[in-house]
């Protein structure tokens, strides 16, 4: 059975790499995983994952996309597709491959030909009105995450406002609030992977 491909998108600094690091660490005993990172001119995120993640270095592939990072996850996904095939051949037991996009704007989305499910992550420091802007990444993702909840008091963000706005544009689609620095809310994301992603794939 092919692994499930989960895309992770969001602006620069929102916590995409940290989310992959935390998920792979927390779920390493139950799921066989690998990760692909997309950066414009470097493979810095892949290097960070190699240092901080429990994933062996050979299970992490860094891609230098050049130009606009959203092109590699939507218009021309060939580099990511090649990396996925490389990981599948190298590790036949893989159950989940995370594809982290380069930092991009609120409208960036993954091609449905590339990923099976997508996560879009923002952080509280971008302001409580961000969910109200309802960019395509936030609307169309299978899971929406508001990260760095611990910063709310320092940036004047009201989490209850962000939650109510998220409910409006997400409708029946799930969303979560996290502080990945302490793993607060990570259990919600892991349950989503277990119940919505892996169980759906079995179905």
Swiss-Prot record:
The keyword Cytoplasm applies. Gene3D superfamilies: P-loop containing nucleotide triphosphate hydrolases. Pfam families: cobW. It comes from Micrococcus luteus (strain ATCC 4698 / DSM 20030 / JCM 1464 / CCM 169 / CCUG 5858 / IAM 1056 / NBRC 3333 / NCIMB 9278 / NCTC 2665 / VKM Ac-2230). SUPFAM superfamilies: P-loop containing nucleoside triphosphate hydrolases. Homodimer. UreD, UreF and UreG form a complex that acts as a GTP-hydrolysis-dependent molecular chaperone, activating the urease apoprotein by helping to assemble the nickel containing metallocenter of UreC. The UreE protein probably delivers the nickel. GO terms for biological process: urea catabolic process. Facilitates the functional incorporation of the urease nickel metallocenter. This process requires GTP hydrolysis, probably effectuated by UreG. One of its GO terms (cellular component) is cytoplasm. GO terms for molecular function: GTP binding; GTPase activity; nickel cation binding. Its main location: cytoplasm. Keywords: Chaperone, Cytoplasm, GTP-binding, Nickel insertion, Nucleotide-binding. The keyword Lyase does not apply. This is Urease accessory protein UreG. GTP binds at residues 10-17. Belongs to the SIMIBI class G3E GTPase family. UreG subfamily. It is found in: Cytoplasm. InterPro entries: CobW/HypB/UreG_nucleotide-bd (IPR003495), P-loop_NTPase (IPR027417), UreG (IPR004400).
């Amino acid at each position: 059975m092919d692994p499930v491909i989960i895309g992770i998108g969001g602006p620069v600094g929102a916590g995409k790499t940290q989310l992959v690091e935390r998920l792979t660490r927390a779920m390493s005993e139950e799921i066989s995983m690998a990760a692909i990172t997309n950066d414009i001119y470097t493979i810095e995120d892949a290097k960070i994952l190699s240092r901080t993640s429990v994933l062996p270095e050979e299970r992490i592939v860094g891609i230098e996309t050049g130009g606009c990072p959203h092109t590699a996850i939507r218009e021309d996904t060939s580099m990511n597709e090649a990396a996925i095939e490389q990981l599948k051949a190298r590790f036949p037991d893989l159950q989940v491959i995370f594809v982290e996009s380069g930092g991009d704007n609120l409208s960036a989305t993954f091609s449905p030909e590339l990923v099976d499910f997508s996560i879009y992550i923002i952080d509280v420091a971008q302001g409580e009105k961000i969910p109200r802007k309802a960019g395509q990444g936030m609307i169309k993702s299978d899971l929406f995450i508001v990260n760095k909840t611990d910063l709310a008091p320092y940036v004047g963000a009201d989490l209850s406002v962000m939650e109510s706005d998220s409910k409006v544009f997400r409708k029946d689609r799930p969303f979560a609030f996290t502080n990945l620095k302490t793993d607060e809310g990570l259990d919600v994301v892991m349950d989503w992977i277990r119940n919505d992603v892996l169980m759906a794939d079995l179905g």
